[in-house]
Amino acid sequence: MLEQEKNPDMNLDIPQRILSHFEAAHKKRQNWETLWDECYDYALPQRGGFTSVPRAGQQRVNKVYDATAMDAVDQLASSLLGNLTPTWSQWFGLKPGPDLSPAEADKISPILEKAAKTIQDHFDRSNFAVEIHQCYLDLIVGGTASLYFEEAQTGELSAFKFSSAPLTHVTLEEGAGGYLDTVYRRLSLTIEQLRARYTQAVWPAALIQRADKDPQEQFKILEAVVPNGLQYNYYAILMEDMSAQELIAHGTFETAPVISFRWVKSPGEIYGRSPVMKALPDIKTANKVVELILKNASIAVTGIWQADDDGVLNPANIELTPGSIIPKAIGSKGLQPLDMPGRFDISQLVLDSL
């Protein structure tokens, strides 16, 4: 649970210090962005946007000719969801530890079982299944995923609220223990969303004026979760005025509010490696082969034609329709189809081997 500090005399150096650390971490992250973009382009094109800002409604599958990778990602994410955190099933439990005697364990077991079912009920009534599935997609494609575990508002069906932070919005750092416990997240929120999320914040007059003109305008926020001993400091910084960033929220968590995890970790690397990264050469090869097959098929259907330059046949006036009469000069071969050099069976053999 977040304990907010209401001291109006917050340290004015905090935004600059947090931004400095964020920029250093983001600079290290940029080494991954080209690889991530390539993985998402072929396996999860509706996400992505690491090296460019995608527009709403933008076509993102222009260079995808083979959907095998996209189908495989969806199937693996569904398998992880069904095997690790199945919906409406008891996928975790509580049991007595080894320090208790058998009599004490028997006495406390029913209490722990009841507590586990209560927690499971809150998971089932929350949006956990939807958000963890999005994390599995990021994990499979990008190798790293982050899940925000927050407290829901009073009166909601569940005490828990979850949100999957896309890899495009998250910058991570490892702590002393090797865990991904330092998290920077960039958000774009409307004034209504800002007031709902940061209830105690005092907003600049310039921001209020802009929001009055356009209530749907989104404002940039940087959230940071930084470990501090056994606790976690939380900061939210308004990023609109780059010359004077403002600290709009500050508090501490007893436990980490963000769960970040990796598929495979390589030595010396912060972010994880994914199955899509391993299969990327085969994915690109299959995509290129299917592209060439489609081009070859279009040529096979429509054909490529050649004609002698005999001064009679004008290619601009020729229509290849039933009943057409095509003029040609005496002794000329006229319009003739060009033999196809490609072989479809070779392309299929390549795909089968992949």
Regions found by a protein language model. Name each.
Residues L112-T118, A129-V130, I191, W203-I208, ...:
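A generic short-segment signal for beta-strand/edge and adjacent turn/coil regions
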